[in-house]
From Swiss-Prot:
Residue span(s) of domain EGF-like: 86-122, 125-165
Active site: 280 (charge relay system), 325 (charge relay system), 422 (charge relay system)
(3R)-3-hydroxyaspartate: modified positions: 103
Domain Gla as annotated: residue spans: 41-86
Gene Ontology biological process terms in this record: blood coagulation; induction of blood coagulation in another organism; proteolysis; venom-mediated blood coagulation
Protein name as catalogued: Coagulation factor X isoform 1
PANTHER family per UniProt: COAGULATION FACTOR (PTHR24278), COAGULATION FACTOR X (PTHR24278:SF28)
Main location (coarse class): secreted
Prosegment location in residue numbers: 21-40, 183-238
Signal peptide stretch: 1-20
Domain Peptidase S1: 239-470
Xref: CDD domains: EGF_CA (cd00054), Tryp_SPc (cd00190)
Length: 483
């Protein structure tokens, strides 16, 4: 009986197996849905594994600390977290005029391009010529709702409306160091006289003959005698402890020769037929010859001689104080420009006062004495001198510093200009263009402690200069003599 009962139980178990299998194992579609919904539990030693952004923050919600572990970088973590928390606030491109958007939590920040401001860079800033010269390379003029840039003679305004492109090989103010620039077609020679103001009567000049022996021009008379030495300022302006100005580095330098062929004053080339100098130089000789392109007067290899046609001396020149110490020499034949002979650029009055004379340094050059009571230099010397504020300038001098003058030089360093440099250029460079800012005028000794060189302030005479140099345009041919 027992064996029969055991057999019956075995048969019953085998008959029930298919039904049990169908209850234990799910169909494939149901099983797949179940697996897709299953979340991963933290595995063993997970805290010791390197971060993974997909595992930490995409498969399940993460904390900022976990995101930092995944990125291992604070900036990347912040960028991710700002979007992760509440979406990308920059997706709508809220920043105008090329501004850059940075997402935040519940907000965003726009970094605006220059000239724009506001939360969305929606406001266009009003540019001012008083701030960085309005980004102009040369001249800046206020206009309605902004500024307008323009360029010096022989330059073209760039496509960006700010830069100035040299219009030829020998554009003004470019020495041999700054000549390797992009060139453009040179427009016809012309001068704009409309934008300059001047505190001085434009017609205040006296035209002199080429033979001006014993002539000192004042407001009252052209027939005064030669200036006598007294307790007046000394026209001993001078380049002391300067360096040699190599060929082409001071191409606007002119040298005035007396009737014996000796150099006695300097000058600045303004145009093919006009040279700027000091009024006090005019009474020092019977005849004047102008030399350009020379750097070594002992060799006489590179210079060109030019005869003088007319000389214009400011009618208000005061020999006793050197006020209005400015004159213009008109040549009989035009200067032939080259790499070594180039005019200095003439600035506008505003540009000179607000930009150039607020630079740290100016450049003075000449053939004058290299030390007080020393010999004149055979080679052209150049020195870089700092501008001196007006209050310091006036306190340092025993003589009047008028509104038509400014000081430059060092308080203690032995660098200055010296006798024989009078009338020469004080140049200021701005964006690789060199502008005439002063005329070497007078000083108390040479490079003396606590004393500075005094210069005629060219910005006071811009219109006066232009009224003269526009009277005659240069001829198409030049005729010059060799030294």
């Amino acid at each position: 009986m027992a064996p029969q009962l055991l057999l019956c139980l075995i048969l019953t178990f085998l008959w029930s197996l298919p039904e049990a299998e169908s209850n234990v194992f799910l169909k494939s579609k149901v099983a797949n849905r179940f697996l897709q919904r299953t979340k991963r539990a933290n595995s063993l030693f997970e805290e010791f594994k390197s971060g993974n952004i997909e595992r930490e923050c995409i498969e399940e919600r993460c904390s900022k600390e976990e995101a930092r572990e995944a990125f291992e970088d604070d900036e990347k973590t912040e960028t991710f977290w700002n979007v992760y928390v509440d979406g990308d606030q920059c997706s709508s491109n809220p920043c105008h005029y090329g501004g850059t958007c940075k997402d935040g939590i519940g907000s965003y920040t726009c970094t605006c391009l220059s000239g724009y401001e506001g939360k969305n860079c929606e406001y266009v800033l009003y540019k001012s010529c008083r701030v960085d010269n309005g980004d102009c390379w040369h001249f800046c003029k206020p206009v309605q709702n902004g500024i307008q840039c323009s360029c010096a003679e022989s330059y073209l305004l760039g496509e960006d409306g700010h830069s100035c492109v040299a219009g030829g090989d020998f554009s003004c103010g470019r020495n041999i160091k700054t000549r390797n620039k992009r060139e453009a077609n040179l427009p016809d020679f012309q001068t704009d006289f409309s934008d300059d103001y001047d505190e001085i009567d434009e017609n205040n000049f006296v035209e002199t003959p080429t033979n001006f022996s014993g002539l000192v021009l004042t407001v009252q008379s052209q027939n005064a005698t030669l200036l006598k030495k007294s307790d007046n300022p000394s026209p001993d302006i001078r380049v002391v402890n300067g360096t040699d100005c190599k060929l082409g580095e001071c191409p606007w330098q002119a040298l005035l020769l007396n009737d014996e062929g000796d150099g006695f004053c300097g000058g600045t080339i303004l145009s093919p037929i006009y040279v700027l100098t000091a009024a006090h130089c005019i009474n020092q000789t019977k005849y004047i010859t102008v030399v350009v392109g020379e750097i070594d007067i002992s060799s006489k290899k590179t210079g060109r001689l030019h005869s003088v046609d007319k000389i214009y001396v400011h009618q208000k020149f005061v020999p006793a104080t050197y006020d209005y110490d400015i004159a213009i020499i008109q040549l009989k034949t035009p200067i032939q420009f080259s790499e070594n002979v180039v005019p200095a650029c003439l600035p506008t009055a505003d540009f000179a006062n607000q930009v150039l004379m607020k630079q740290n340094f100016g450049i003075v050059s000449g053939f004058g004495r290299t030390r007080e009571r020393g010999k004149t230099s055979n080679t052209l010397k150049v020195v870089t001198l700092p501008y001196v504020d007006r209050h310091t300038c006036m306190l340092s001098s025993n003589f009047p510093i008028t509104q038509n003058m400014f000081c430059a030089g060092y308080d203690t360093l032995p660098q200055d200009a010296c006798q024989g440099d009078s009338g020469g250029p004080h140049i200021t460079a701005y964006r690789d263009t060199h502008f005439i800012t002063g005329i070497v005028s007078w000083g108390e000794g040479c490079a003396q402690t606590g004393k500075y060189g005094v210069y005629t302030k060219v910005s006071k005479f811009i219109l006066w200069i232009k009224r003269i140099i526009r009277q005659k345009q240069p001829s198409t041919e030049s005729s010059t003599g060799r030294l």
